[in-house]
């Protein structure tokens, strides 16, 4: 029988990948881009952040709170996610030709950079130290399954935004990772059969 835990990246590696994906997308966004590209990139950023925040809130943060709920980074995670959702709502209410749209993308980027720095320098290393490789892999499997549930209803929109917003090499990288995630799902179905 196939052990998915050994195939799945650890939850901390998945979180780092999410951070990298969003940062790459932010770097694709320029104020001089065509409105259709700006809209597609902004929507890609918003969707990725919403999915990422949901995964952290449902799977990662509860486990971290159990092992060290007093960690300041974990205590400020919920307010940071709430602020992110507020900015996303405001961003979606603006059009890509409005100056406010560009300002909100930059505000969101600053907030995300701060959040990523906290997680990657404090929270993720601590989780790796305290949880151990097997538990991190188990959580990675949970995160992969939940991610697929969250992505499935948005797959068409995600693909369209990727095609519009990304350069060829970036789109290929993103689609390659998406293909890998789908392969994990396929393998899990085969293993269960």
Enumerate the language-model features and the residues they cover.
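Small-residue-biased structural context
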Residues: 1-193
């Amino acid at each position: 029988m196939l052990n998915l835990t050994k195939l799945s990246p650890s939850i901390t590696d998945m979180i780092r990948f999410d951070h990298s994906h969003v940062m790459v997308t932010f770097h694709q966004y320029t104020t001089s881009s065509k409105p259709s590209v700006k809209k597609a990139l902004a929507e890609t950023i918003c969707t990725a952040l919403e999915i990422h925040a949901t995964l952290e809130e449902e799977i990662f943060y509860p486990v971290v709170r159990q092992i060290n709920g007093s960690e300041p980074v974990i205590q400020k995670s919920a307010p940071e996610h709430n602020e992110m959702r507020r900015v996303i709502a405001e961003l979606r209410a603006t059009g890509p030709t409005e100056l406010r749209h560009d300002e909100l993308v930059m505000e969101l980027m600053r907030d995300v950079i701060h959040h990523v720095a906290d997680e990657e320098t404090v929270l993720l290393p601590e989780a790796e130290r305290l949880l151990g490789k097997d538990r991190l892999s188990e959580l990675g499997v949970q995160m992969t399954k939940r991610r697929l549930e969250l992505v499935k209803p948005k797959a068409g929109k995600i693909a369209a935004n990727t095609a519009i917003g990304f350069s060829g090499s970036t789109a290929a990288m993103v689609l390659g990772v998406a293909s890998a995630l789908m392969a994990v799902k396929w393998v899990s179905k085969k293993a269960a059969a």
